[in-house]
């Protein structure tokens, strides 16, 4: 790994439809092979489906879902005296969002619905209701952190 300076974080521009940076980041997560237009269509169609299904603003449902997905604690491996310990640590805000989006998109891709927009819409609605695979991933992460609470004093 290079020991040079860390590359500066690039600013993400808000998307044109919802004027939200987190929606832009979702589009970037959904995007495959650089096809941003296709990814944007999938996300916007999913948001339309959410609006039709719930009757409320899709962005509010999405933000509720993200709050339910984003982890507060995670475990990191720490080597102490020849053995590895899973040490629970708090998750930084930027990483919380990144993990939440990653888990949401991965859970959507693993679903059985026919189109990606349907999978994404259903996963967002499930997450907003505190169900679904992405919320389960968060619960598992928190459970691991709780189980390894005894090693919290190894935090760095």
Curated annotation (Swiss-Prot):
Keywords: Ribonucleoprotein, Ribosomal protein, RNA-binding, rRNA-binding, tRNA-binding. GO terms for cellular component: small ribosomal subunit. Pfam families: Ribosomal_S7. One of its GO terms (molecular function) is tRNA binding. SUPFAM superfamilies: Ribosomal protein S7 (SSF47973). GO terms for biological process: translation. It comes from the Bacteria. InterPro entries: Ribosomal_uS7 (IPR000235), Ribosomal_uS7_bac/org-type (IPR005717), Ribosomal_uS7_CS (IPR020606), Ribosomal_uS7_dom (IPR023798), Ribosomal_uS7_dom_sf (IPR036823). One of the primary rRNA binding proteins, it binds directly to 16S rRNA where it nucleates assembly of the head domain of the 30S subunit. Is located at the subunit interface close to the decoding center, probably blocks exit of the E-site tRNA. Belongs to the universal ribosomal protein uS7 family. PANTHER family: RIBOSOMAL PROTEIN S7. Part of the 30S ribosomal subunit. Contacts proteins S9 and S11. This is Small ribosomal subunit protein uS7. It comes from Streptococcus agalactiae serotype V (strain ATCC BAA-611 / 2603 V/R). The gene is rpsG.
